[in-house]
Swiss-Prot record:
Entry binding sites for Mg(2+) 2: 599, 646, 669, 740
Cofactor binding comment, as recorded: Binds 2 magnesium ions for reverse transcriptase polymerase activity. Binds 2 magnesium ions for ribonuclease H (RNase H) activity. Substrate-binding is a precondition for magnesium binding.
Listed GO CC annotations: host cell; host cell cytoplasm; host cell nucleus; virion component
Comment text on domains: The reverse transcriptase/ribonuclease H (RT) is structured in five subdomains: finger, palm, thumb, connection and RNase H. Within the palm subdomain, the 'primer grip' region is thought to be involved in the positioning of the primer terminus for accommodating the incoming nucleotide. The RNase H domain stabilizes the association of RT with primer-template. Integrase core domain contains the D-x(n)-D-x(35)-E motif, named for the phylogenetically conserved glutamic acid and aspartic acid residues and the invariant 35 amino acid spacing between the second and third acidic residues. Each acidic residue of the D,D(35)E motif is independently essential for the 3'-processing and strand transfer activities of purified integrase protein.
Catalytic function, reaction form: Endonucleolytic cleavage to 5'-phosphomonoester; DNA(n) + a 2'-deoxyribonucleoside 5'-triphosphate = DNA(n+1) + diphosphate
Species per Swiss-Prot/TrEMBL record: Simian foamy virus type 3 (strain LK3) (SFVagm)
Site (Cleavage) residue list: 596-597, 751-752
Name listed for the protein in its UniProt record: Pro-Pol polyprotein
Residue ranges occupied by any Reverse transcriptase domain in the UniProt entry: 186-363
Domain Integrase catalytic as annotated: residue spans: 864-1023
E.C. designation(s): 2.7.7.49, 2.7.7.7, 3.1.26.4, 3.4.23.-
Length: 1143
């Protein structure tokens, strides 16, 4: 504007009122008429200096217009009827041509865009005219910054200020570029020279064109800055939701952060030092924690009315099918950006093209692919010389990780170099160079990926190899994948079974799939035949921790996920073949025709001329599916070692197996024998049965015999099972203990005919070695093949360990007696250490006792819910019915206010969600509750009801199943309603509909024995106009009514929680509990099998795995503590496994 024109009045507008404004070159703050500030709230006070002296005046923040342009500025009041405008508030009025250091070749950029555009004819001419019309929008100078005309941002810090940081050493080559940037920003007011107690180091970063970018390390500042809730949408979500029209445009907002002003109170936080001078930012700095979110939120809000627009930080994407519509919307975007004060860089923009680059990908009609720029960067990669270069290369490769099926496996050797680096020095080999080139070649030839279609279901295909898992995502019915995922197993996961590896891969894939699903179902295809059957995988066959299994199994209950078996998975046929581990090969014992348990033992020979006396034990059993002994052998071997006895026992079992049709399993507790058979025997056969030192094997005849048997019958499987394990800890414990007992007996047979009843423990006892628990002052001797102990109360038999559970069980099963009775019965004939504990262990495995015995301990006392402080804070709702049909209605919805007990009754034809919502909509026209409590009926747990409550801002609460005490208030009202209706409808039960208003009025005016008031009095403060009403309250003024109401409510008290019974138990995590059977029939079990407590919600509610394997919240009233748990500790897992297997 010509300076002479500033003498003329300017057109202004405040709150719709037009008035005049005058330019005042001496004004430091704008002054507006007092009348426009009467309803405004001052933000601070300042001292104003005029010709009459200094005066303190309040400052307001006001929005008004000057010359039709919106101005937001700090103002003070004036007595005049016009505005005095400060030049700093309307700098654009006297705008001088911008002069910065480097002019950009704008003409070349426009010519390039016109040449590359897919627009033709008049549309192309229209685009050229838009370039001229919006010339002020384009970036003309490097480092040119816009000015967003909005309220400045305030940078809030926490209670602790950030610590100033020292400046890093600066590369001398960067100084010239950084100084140019600082000079240009000073000219535009983006930087000011100002001292501060804070300092942030400058970190110059080289650009591809040889210049340097000024970056500041704000990490210390960001530690103290609260993260705002609104954050940028993930790029994957944006790519899946963009419109892919024929014409696509991308715009780059130049230096967008620097267009947003910050408050002067925030300047000090942004300070940095350059060449001895300290500077502060007046705009949002790059590197500040909340800059991307604040900037993106503004641009998104600015362009929200324009269709088919997506924004990610400073990148804008626009697409349409029609060229005319595309140009019209482009002009609208240009206009909005110009008026908002932004600047667009045409250097990085692409306009009206069929393929554009957005978020680092090449966007096409079908999907996304790697850009030519990215591929060129890959081709320019050279072998790294130090650790930093290697990390930079891996970061570049990682951007394209979803384009290769086995990316993680390919880059793992390169990541291993980082782990072995010595400081910044790395060891790089020709193999590493070959691997790097292989990855680059695969990425450059990678096909485009399809984008996620939110209208169809998501397909996830999973497979595994011994070292990694492979995942592919598809849109339903599509052939092109959305992305690939590759997961390399950890050292622990490599040891998993194949099923567990697949479950691990599924878990990793579902974490991503739940993001990609976009509300649609997820169909998971894998080589697992049945996901439900793997829940029954025995504990011994599980190598993963139980917490992993719980996580994996939780997916079976997710309604968003469906699992399918796919034997072929043709897309994954190139994956290396999956090799089975030993656990995966071994079937359940019931799948074998016969199972042999073998063991060998040796003792010191009683003849001094001989060193040992060995024996072997073999047990032939079948699982039908119960453990059933077919035959046993206890064979003395004479003067031999225990090792020979172990080999001889396996040889004996192999010879017996030759006579059996079908697969045979041989179990030995000798690791040496099992490993030798499975790994070394083929080598021994090939080299003539010599060991690694080329010496003949010991017991070579027996190894040859075993090799011949396996060759004649290849379906003989020999495995190792650790011996002397707790009872029922694995499938093979019982058979192993039996074989151990037989082997010990065989080793004691020298020249006698009686087979002693011994095992390894009793063998030590007879040799004068006292195992733990056997007192030394007792006398122990072998009599008639049994070990006897002489104690003060007489002689007793000490049975072998393997026989003890059966002895206890036999005594207990006579009458299913309790602990003490069973103990007395057993101890009358037998004795061993910890006999009483063993009795408890065996009894608590008795399934019949566990599911039928009554609870021995009482539940904790009922918790009193807190009474709400106001009416309408919380409602209890429930249905009564079905009742006899009356006017077409069968049910009544009962709504009770928790604070007052006031009741509303709504007749309904069915207890449905729609009927519930309809009734509650009428009630919420009076007031909206904060909480609604109900049982878990279908009408209250549906998604429709949840959506209705969410829209109303209501929180839903549910009581635990089979526990009406949780909704005691509404349950008591239900009984009162039924009782009253029954009395009023004697002889005419179908007339209840007409009496509902009478019942509601009666209940709301009935006195509560505990509070001494009626619900009507607690809600309104006065009586209703009914018989026996207190007439004094009907004539009170409104103030007196409110005073009386406050007095009544404050006098209420919450009944105290009753004291706990001395036999009450308190739940804790890990306790074994049993859930009550909901409706047990006569002579049927009253309790389900034991299950551990997973989580304690409160003293009255816990989370367990129910008998169907589902995670459920239940009340302790429906649980009993499993018997014989000391101090609430759980039983051994072996006991639970045994019961689960039995059930």
């Amino acid at each position: 504007m010509d300076p002479l024109q500033l003498l003329q009045p300017l057109e202004a507008e405040i709150k719709g009122t037009k008035l005049k404004a005058h330019w005042d070159s001496g004004a430091t703050i704008t002054c507006v008429p007092q009348a426009f500030l009467e309803e405004e709230v001052p933000i601070k006070n300042i001292w104003i200096k005029t010709i009459h002296g200094e005066k303190e005046q309040p400052v307001y923040y006001l929005t008004f217009k000057i010359q039709g342009r919106k101005v937001e500025a700090e103002v003070i009041s004036s007595p005049y009827d016009y505005i005095l405008v400060s030049p700093s508030d309307i700098p654009w009025l006297m705008k001088k041509p911008l002069q910065l250091t480097t002019l950009v070749p704008l003409q070349e950029y426009e010519e390039r865009l016109l040449k590359q555009t897919m627009l033709t004819g008049s549309y192309k001419e229209k685009l050229q005219s838009l370039f001229l019309k919006y010339d002020a929008l384009w970036q003309h100078w490097e480092n040119q910054v816009g000015h967003r005309r909005i309220k400045p941002h305030h940078i809030a810090t926490g209670t602790v200020n950030p610590r100033p940081q020292k400046q890093y050493p600066i590369n001398p080559k960067a100084k010239a570029s950084i100084q140019t940037v600082i000079n240009d920003l000073l000219k535009q007011g983006v930087l000011i020279q100002q001292n501060s107690i804070m300092n942030t180091p400058v970190y110059p970063v080289p650009k591809p064109d040889g210049k340097w970018r000024m970056v500041l390390d704000y990490r210390e500042v960001n530690k103290t800055i609260p993260l705002i809730a609104a954050q940028n949408q993930h790029s994957a979500g944006i790519l899946s939701s963009i419109f892919r029209g024929k014409y696509k445009t991308t715009l780059d907002l130049s230096n967008g952060f620097w267009a947003h002003s910050i408050t002067p109170e925030s300047y000090w936080l942004t300070a940095f030092t350059w060449l001895g001078q300290q500077y502060c930012w007046t705009r949002l700095p790059q590197g500040f924690l909340n800059s991307p979110a604040l900037f993106t939120a503004d641009v998104v809000d600015l362009l929200k009315e324009v269709p088919n627009v997506q924004v990610y930080v400073d990148d804008i994407y626009i697409s349409h099918d029609d060229p005319r519509e595309h140009l019209e919307q482009l002009e609208k975007v240009f206009s909005l950006l110009l008026n908002a004060g932004y600047v667009v860089s045409l250097k990085k923009s692409e306009i009206a093209q069929h393929e554009v680059e957005f978020l680092g990908f090449n966007i096409t009609k079908e999907g996304r692919g790697l850009t030519e720029t990215f591929k060129q960067k890959l081709l320019n990669i050279t072998p790294p010389r130090d650790l930093k270069q290697l990390q930079s290369i891996l970061g570049l490769l990682n951007f394209a990780r979803n384009f290769i099926p086995n990316f993680s496996e390919l880059v793992k050797p390169l990541y291993n170099i980082i782990a072995t680096a010595n400081g910044k020095y790395i060891t790089w080999t020709t193999d590493n160079s070959q691997q790097l080139q292989n990855i680059i070649s695969m990425l450059n030839s990678a096909e485009n990926l399809e984008e996620r279609n939110p209208e169809v279901r998501l397909i996830m295909k999973v497979n595994t190899s011994p070292s990694a898992g492979y995942i592919r995502f598809y849109n339903e019915f599509a052939k092109r994948p959305i992305m690939y995922l590759n997961y390399v197993y950890t050292k622990a996961e490599v040891k998993f079974t194949n099923t567990e590896k697949l479950l691990t891969t599924i878990h990793k894939g579902l974490i991503k799939a739940l993001d990609l699903g976009m509300g649609q179902e997820i169909l998971v295809y894998s080589p697992i035949v049945s996901m439900t059957k793997i829940q029954k995988t025995p504990l011994p066959e599980r190598k993963a921790l139980p917490i992993r299994w719980i996580t994996w199994m939780s997916y079976l209950e997710d309604p968003r996920i469906q699992f399918h078996y796919d034997k072929t998975l043709p897309e994954l046929q190139q994956v290396p073949t999956v090799t089975d581990d030993i656990i995966a090969k071994i079937k359940h014992p019931s799948e074998f025709s016969m199972v042999f348990y073998t063991d060998g033992s040796a003792i010191k020979h009683p003849n001094v001329n001989k060193s040992h006396n060995a024996g072997m034990g073999i047990a032939q059993v079948q699982f039908k599916p119960e453990f059933t002994v077919i035959n046993t052998w206890s064979i003395p071997l004479g003067d031999h070692t225990a090792q020979l006895a172990e080999v001889a026992a396996v040889e004996f079992a192999c010879k017996k197996a030759l006579k059996i049709d079908g697969p045979v399993l041989i179990v030995t507790d000798s690791f040496y024998v099992a490993e030798s058979v499975n790994k070394e025997l083929p080598y021994w056969q090939s080299n003539g049965f010599f060991n690694n030192k080329k010496k003949p094997l010991k017991h070579v005849s027996k190894w040859k015999s075993i090799a011949d048997c396996i060759q004649l019958k290849p379906d003989i499987i020999i495995i190792h099972e650790k011996g002397h394990q707790p009872t029922a800890s694995t499938f093979h414990t019982e058979g192993n203990n039996l074989a151990d007992k037989l082997a010990t007996q065989g080793s004691y047979v020298v020249n006698i005919n009686t087979t002693p009843s011994l095992d390894a423990e009793l063998d030590q006892l007879l040799q004068g070695q006292y195992p733990k628990g056997f007192p030394k002052h007792y006398q122990y001797q072998l009599e008639n093949g049994q070990v006897m102990v002489t104690r003060p109360n007489g002689k007793r038999i000490i049975p072998p360990k393997s026989d003890r559970p059966q002895i206890i069980l036999q005594a207990h099963n006579i009458a299913h007696t309790g602990r003490d009775s069973t103990f007395l019965k057993v101890s009358s004939k037998y004795w061993w250490p910890n006999l009483r504990k063993d009795v408890v262990k065996v009894i608590r495995q008795c399934k019949q006792c566990l599911v039928t015995n009554a609870a021995t301990l009482a539940a904790p006392p009922i918790l009193r819910p807190e009474r709400p402080v106001k009416p309408f804070d919380k409602f209890f709702i429930d249905y009564i019915g079905p009742l006899p049909p009356s006017n077409g209605y069968l049910h009544v919805l009962v709504v009770v206010d928790s604070m007052t007990g006031f009741v509303w009754l709504y007749p309904t034809k069915a207890p449905s969600t729609s009927a519930t919502v309809k009734a509650l909509n009428m009630l919420t026209s009076i007031a909206v509750p904060k909480v609604i409590h109900s049982d878990q009926g279908a009408a209250f747990t549906s998604a429709t009801f949840a959506d209705w409550a969410k829209n109303k801002g209501i929180q839903l609460e549910f009581s635990t199943p089979y526990h009406p005490q949780s909704s005691g208030k509404v349950e008591r009202k239900n009984s009162d309603i039924k009782r009253l209706l029954t009395k009023l409808l004697v002889g005419r039960p179908a007339k209840w509909y007409d009496l509902l208003p009478v019942v509601q009025l009666a209940l709301n005016n009935s006195y509560s024995p505990s509070s001494k008031y009626t619900p009507h009095q607690l809600l309104f403060g006065i009586d209703s106009n009914t018989p026996f009403a207190n007439s004094d309250t009907l004539d009170l003024s409104r103030e007196e009514e409110l005073s009386l109401l406050q007095e009544i409510r404050s006098s209420l008290y919450l009944p105290s929680t009753p004291p706990a019974s001395i036999r009450a138990w308190s739940p804790s995590v890990g306790q074994l509990v049993q859930e009550r059977v909901a409706r047990p029939a006569s002579l049927r079990p009253r309790w389900h099998k034991p299950t551990p407590v997973l989580e304690v919600i409160n003293p009255r509610a816990v989370v367990i795995l129910d008998h169907l394997g589902n995670r459920r919240t239940v009340s302790v009233d429906n649980l009993k503590l499993t018997a014989y748990q000391k101090d609430g500790t759980p039983n051994e897992s072996a006991a639970v496994v045994a019961m689960e297997k039995d059930e």
